[in-house]
Amino acid sequence: VLDQVSDGLPERIQLKLDEVRKGLPSLFQAGYPTALQHDDFLENNFHVNEATGHITGVVDWAAAIIAPFGVSLGALEVIIGIQTASCWHFHPNHIELREHFWDTFYQEAGQISAADRRSIEVARLFGLFRTHGFEERDARVMYLEALSML
């Protein structure tokens, strides 16, 4: 998948893709979990309680996968941004929202080693490249640059 995605990408994105390639073995080491993942976690596939902001349901599990943990965590970027035909626009507070997500995630997950945190980031980036790496030429570069260079 990554070899197919890499064709024609600018060097700055190739460097990020190389980081993912180097980290992929960590996703398949003994002890690193696989998990059922939604794999299409877009804003129209989850229900939120408007009063509390809590997720109350997730729908459309047809594309669910079992994969190394974290492959679908790139969906966070889709939730705090919007894709148009010519650009990726992030919510004005996307930095704070992203920090809050990861702070909460790691607090709720409990003890996670530094190595597993790196593996989660590799999995997240792999998911972003897999999901957005097959867009049309110009859109592909724009989306990958916006989403993977954070």
Residues of each region from the PLM?
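An alpha-helical support segment within catalytic cores of ATP-dependent transferases
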Residues: 1-39, 47-54
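Alpha-helix initiation/capping motif
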Residues: 2, 6-10, 30, 34, ...
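Catalytic activation segment of kinase domains across protein kinase-like and atypical kinase folds
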Residues: 44-73
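Helix-rich C-terminal or lid/interface subdomains of diverse kinases
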Residues: 63-68, 75-150
